[in-house]
């Protein structure tokens, strides 16, 4: 009698990161899941254009292309470092840097990569903070066609 290998349901896991402690915790969970499922990770960091909607923001100088390149280079270095760490734990990992609204970009990447799961850290903001600042995790959970795992920061 031959034994059938267990099904691998989580082949591609997209992990959104803002490089926070909370995002690192979410990445650790994602690495563990991918490792146990024989899956792959795709890390995503989204850079946002400075908000110009408020008077204070409008008074600030808009970053020139040199500043944008510095932001991109710093983010690429962090993504590559985090991908190497996941690879050392035996999980094939790729990464991507995007510009735009984080929730929209993560949903777009998850669909394009045919992700089985999206993993995000969540900071547990108050209702007022969510109303004023929004919540990337909340928006992804609400709008994504792909299942989403949110990981809270350790208290």
Region roles according to the model:
Residues 58-62, 112-114, 136-137:
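Short, hinge-like loop/turn segments at secondary-structure boundaries
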Residues 62-77:
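A short acidic, glycine-rich active-site loop
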Residues 1-9, 36, 81-118, 155:
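Structural beta-alpha unit
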Residues 117-139, 153:
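Glycine-rich, Arg-bearing micro-motifs that act as flexible, cationic patches
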Residues 44, 94-98, 149:
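General small-molecule cofactor/ligand-binding pocket signal
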Residues 148-154:
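Short, flexible loop segments at boundaries between secondary-structure elements
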Residues 3-62, 91:
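Small/aliphatic-rich secondary-structure junction motif
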């Amino acid at each position: 009698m031959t034994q059938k290998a267990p099904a691998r349901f989580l082949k591609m896991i997209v992990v959104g990161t803002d490089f926070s402690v909370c995002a690192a915790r979410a990445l650790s969970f994602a690495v563990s899941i991918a490792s146990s499922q024989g899956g792959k990770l795709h890390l995503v960091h989204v850079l946002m254009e400075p908000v110009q909607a408020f008077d204070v923001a409008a008074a600030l100088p808009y970053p020139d292309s040199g500043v944008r390149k510095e932001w991109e280079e710093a983010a690429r270095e962090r993504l590559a470092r985090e991908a190497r760490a996941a690879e050392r734990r035996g999980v094939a990992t790729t990464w991507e840097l995007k510009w735009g609204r984080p929730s929209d970009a993560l949903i777009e990447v998850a669909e394009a990569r045919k992700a089985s799961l999206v993993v995000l850290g969540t900071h547990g903001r108050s209702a007022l903070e969510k109303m004023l600042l929004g919540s990337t995790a909340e928006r992804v959970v609400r709008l994504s066609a792909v299942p989403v795992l949110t990981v809270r920061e350790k208290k």
